[in-house]
Amino acid sequence: MSSSRPASSSSSRNRQSSRARVLAQTTLDAELNAEYEESGDSFDYSKLVEAQRDGPPVQQGRSEKVIAYLQHIQKGKLIQTFGCMLALDEKSFNVIAFSENAPEMLTTVSHAVPSVDDPPRLGIGTNVRSLFSDQGATALHKALGFADVSLLNPILVQCKTSGKPFYAIVHRATGCLVVDFEPVKPTEFPATAAGALQSYKLAAKAISKIQSLPGGSMEVLCNTVVKEVFDLTGYDRVMAYKFHEDDHGEVFAEITKPGLEPYLGLHYPATDIPQAARFLFMKNKVRMICDCRARSIKVIEAEALPFDISLCGSALRAPHSCHLQYMENMNSIASLVMAVVVNENEEDDEAESEQPAQQQQKKKLWGLLVCHHESPRYVPFPLRYACEFLAQVFAVHVNREFELEKQLREKSILKMQTMLSDMLFREASPLTIVSGAPNIMDLVKCDGAALLYGGKVWRLRNAPTESQIHDIAFWLSDVHRDSTGLSTDSLHDAGYPGASALGDMICGMAVAKINSKDIIFWFRSHTAAEIRWGGAKHDSSDMDDSRRMHPRLSFKAFLEVVKMKSLPWTDYEMDAIHSLQLILRGTLNDASKPKREASLDNQIGDLKLDGLAELQAVTSEMVRLMETATVPILAVDGNGLVNGWNQKAAELTGLRVDDAIGRHILTLVEESSVPVVQRMLYLALQGKEEKEVRFEVKTHGPRRDDGPVILVVNACASRDLHDHVVGVCFVAQDMTVHKLVMDKFTRVEGDYKAIIHNPNPLIPPIFGADEFGWCSEWNAAMTKLTGWNRDEVLDKMLLGEVFDSSNASCPLKNKNAFVSLCVLINSALAGEETEKAPFGFFDRSGKYIECLLSANRKENEGGLITGVFCFIHVASHELQHALQVQQASEQTSLKRLKAFSYMRHAINNPLSGMLYSRKALKNTDLNEEQMKQIHVGDNCHHQINKILADLDQDSISEKSSCLDLEMAEFVFQDVVVAAVSQVLITCQGKGIRISCNLPERFMKQSVYGDGVRLQQILSDFLFISVKFSPVGGSVEISSKLTKNSIGENLHLIDLELRIKHQGLGVPAELMEQMFEEDNKEQSDEGLGLLVSRKLLRLMNGDVRHLREAGVSTFILTAELASAPTAIGQ
């Protein structure tokens, strides 16, 4: 598959290519199925798959064959034998279709149940109420009132004739209600709780194990889930089957009973699981086949029905003959499959929080959890539902792993782009990113790369020959003339005539055109080179029958399909290549236009004005909030000493503000809370802000006997103007009264209803459910918060009708939020200890409410769990306002970071133009003095590049990686001349004379060290000296060198530079900023001096400042190594 680079976004391109791929794949599926139906025993799977690969491209469209195939898949009229099925008319509740085994299963008379009436007969038109006891019939009829009838599954019903219990599993189909009936085994305790409540109890251990995983490894997550499903279901083999971008599948994780051949690492063609089957998995997320050898049961329909009854949603739907043969060939007699459905792309996560739940994001099938058994096996519906719930929890964690992988991937690509950009800006030639380290092969995963530049070719590793590169470039200019780039996983499929000559080792290619003649290529080998068989070695004497569908044959077919294909190029890889393409184009262009410089100046000016005003407003607002807030707010400095303690904190603890200031925070909290506060303080000082942390604060004076104050706290790192963390602010909420109320509930003492419905504002919003999942409590505070009255939500399903991801009273943001709520409530019902969890929902008016939710079990006098109580904690208006101000401050910082990024990028372009101009001048007829000036410009350019690289770092500190040193040979004369040149214009404006009393021996001395950093240091101190010199004054530079021998040919040089200037000297405030990193009023000049001092200390030196009558002197010291030769010798 190949594509020229479009103008649309990555997600748009992804959706378009996905739709095209599904259409093409569905056509292939239909052709395979038709061939199978027509061929019978002569069907040759391997040859047919290979023929599809080598044949002409399929015609995408709704051909008669495809439509017939889809109808055959979705409208089969057969069911499996482990239950029976009825289709009911919703208005009359009469039977309009039934399976042939339904009369026997539902109406057979049992001698253990005496009856004077004739047994009911089951047929078309029978009213279903006549078949079951009154309680069961009523429960079935109740399901009609639900928009989503599956909420009540399974419904426990009892036959009138036999008294046998059945699970009734209800779902809606076109024009009717389809009910599956599965008998309850005598050894099985029948499920009475609705839906997820009963299922969670079965899957609680497995869910807890998954929830406890630290994250960061998809492999660990998949291995854990297959192990838990293996223990939960008892199947012989459990696999995590992952779909790749091109729809082919891979056994990503596996566990088996001893003695089975492993399938781990096998890859299967996309046709092994047809697109129609994947669509059904999206609708019906659990699929069980009990016995692939059992005879299917026919479904009898009423005559002249105006519609076809679809069994797509039925758990009893019979599998198709092709799949049954595949199962038997691999000796898998029974199977259970759960769909793993995830978000289609990460961008939707950010958008969806701004929209009501009804506008659901797109989903995709990530893969399947597949269970196989070597003998017939039946899993009761409650356990299947538990497996489905477990798969939903697993999908939530898969989404999280995707997000984490995306962040790490973007960080890695950004780092590589920055390094390549710096290399380009230093040399202004694409050759540097081919011959240097890192190079273009480090940007994206590939097996080889090449650069075609100026008619010449540079090759890296597994790349075509020089003549083949020229041939590919000619083909691109002829066939893809208008595109700026190209990506393909198969040069053969893309139509390149020389693909066969390249062989299997070069199949995929990505291209970035710098201009019409200069091109960068990336190459990939065939996919089979990346695939490794993860199971047992194949016995060479065991010849595969190509007509016998089997996992090993599927693997072989897959290798044939991808023989001339590479791994596909992902959207993020192409975005990285496109970014490098833009950088290359900008670097190689001439000097930027003056308009861009003017735009940069304007944006910098606007940023300074807007940023300063916004920062002042935020600071004033924060101070006012802290003093007047009705929530406790406390602050500490970097040493943990209290420097903020508002009136609310003093009121709650009895400790006055004056008494609290200056005390260490750990002395003010209860001993049990010391580790919690220590951790919170440590992380906040590192810039990692924790939220919703609970700890207890001691009480003093008149409050001493009241016991500790319980606070739930958000930590906010306090930063200075230069973004250094200088302290921590704690915005808290008093939870003492809240805890007393909760304690009263958990003890189940007295009349709790009097508390629930108390209008006292101290009573938080509370709702509850009984052990069956029906909403049983909804207090006045909850009505005020949601807009829904008590009588509108009572006796509704809490999970599904009151709270759900769609069509509920209080819609949740997405399916992941619903799964998290299910886990929390069911954990409490299972008797587990739960912690507060972030929670959000849309109220009646559509406003999104963010809060904390805690769930607590409700017990009767005998200690049995009879339900769950849930407490909602919503932040006060003051706390919400404080968080908004904090968010505004963070947005201001983010704007500045983005501005820095823009400035860095925008500055580099004119610098590249200047570099180009200087290189062009070098090729002209210049005299020696003119060449020296060009050399000075080059040195200043290197200094700017070094400073711009520092902007990529998060902070400037002594331990920061941005203040690094590069060891290289340089001459003092180059450093001094370049540094002095940077202040000459200022000197001319003030009439200041600079004299360099430096001996020639010093100027010609060749040394090892970081000459660019030394140049930066010298220029900074020269600038300060000139700035604070009087008009008409002078600045003098002198030096002293001391050599210390540390070997025969190696000496250490102790360098001392003195910069003396006239006048009153540098202000004391500015000098303090040079020595004090945490100075809150640090100026630009102060920061420059601070950085220069840090650089000197990295060179084992320092700076001193002497002030005499009318004269001030900076004394700079550093340690360097002497080079073996000197210039001119």
Curated annotation (Swiss-Prot):
Q: Which PROSITE patterns has this protein been placed in? A: HIS_KIN, PAS, PHYTOCHROME_1, PHYTOCHROME_2
> A Pfam family in this protein?
PAS_2
CDD domains on file: HATPase_Phy-like (cd16932), HisKA (cd00082), PAS (cd00130)
The UniProt annotation places phytochromobilin binding at: 322
Question: What keyword terms does UniProt attach to this protein?
Answer: Chromophore, Photoreceptor protein, Receptor, Repeat, Sensory transduction, Transcription, Transcription regulation
Please name the GO terms that the record assigns under molecular function: phosphorelay sensor kinase activity; photoreceptor activity; protein homodimerization activity
Q: Indicate yes or no for the key word Ribosomal protein.
A: no
Q: Which GO terms describe its biological process?
A: detection of visible light; red, far-red light phototransduction; regulation of DNA-templated transcription
- Domain GAF positions: 217-402
Q: What does this protein do?
A: Regulatory photoreceptor which exists in two forms that are reversibly interconvertible by light: the Pr form that absorbs maximally in the red region of the spectrum and the Pfr form that absorbs maximally in the far-red region. Photoconversion of Pr to Pfr induces an array of morphogenic responses, whereas reconversion of Pfr to Pr cancels the induction of those responses. Pfr controls the expression of a number of nuclear genes including those encoding the small subunit of ribulose-bisphosphate carboxylase, chlorophyll A/B binding protein, protochlorophyllide reductase, rRNA, etc.
* Family the UniProt entry places it in: Belongs to the phytochrome family.
- Annotated protein name in UniProt: Phytochrome A type 4
- Organism of derivation: Avena sativa
Q: What is the lineage of its organism?
A: Eukaryota, Viridiplantae, Streptophyta, Embryophyta, Tracheophyta
